[in-house]
């Protein structure tokens, strides 16, 4: 779990008071963009996962960098070679995405960042 606490408006020293406020209905809900990832395998049935921060596709145990072609809604955007790629929501843009050199996105913006991990090129940058 992250340690910056952007989603937590209470300090750990205020846990008791915070729980009481939540039980009293004194809280605010914020809608956040989420991602759904589906892993398709030749041997297993597809598995779906939901993510609040990001989805990462990496080279795994292989020692060589991997080629990635990025499409959004069947429209080609880019091809690059890298150790992996991070698809990040605005909520997750301050986590792994930021560490990989990606942009910080406003929480209420309806987009995501696609950021290469250690791209083997000087001009492979994030796509928003």
Segment roles from a protein language model:
Residues 1-3, 119:
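Short, acidic/turn-prone active-site loops that include or flank metal/cofactor-
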Residues 3-83:
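Catalytic core of DAGKc-family lipid kinases
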Residues 128:
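C-terminal active-site/capping subdomain that shapes the small-molecule cofactor and substrate pocket
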Residues 79-82, 87-123:
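Gly/Ser/Thr-rich active-site loops/lids in small-molecule metabolic enzymes
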């Amino acid at each position: 779990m992250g340690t910056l606490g952007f989603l937590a408006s209470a300090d750990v020293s205020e846990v008791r008071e915070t729980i009481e406020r939540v039980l009293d209905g004194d809280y605010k809900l914020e809608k956040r963009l989420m991602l759904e990832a589906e892993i398709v395998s030749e041997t297993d049935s597809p598995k779906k996962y939901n993510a609040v921060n990001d989805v990462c596709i990496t080279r795994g145990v292989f020692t060589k960098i991997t080629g990635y072609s990025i499409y959004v809604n069947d429209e080609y955007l880019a091809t690059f070679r890298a150790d992996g790629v991070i698809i990040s929501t605005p909520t997750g843009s301050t986590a792994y995405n930021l560490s990989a050199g990606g942009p910080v996105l406003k929480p209420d913006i309806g987009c995501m960042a696609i950021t290469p991990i250690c791209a083997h090129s000087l001009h492979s940058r994030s796509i928003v």
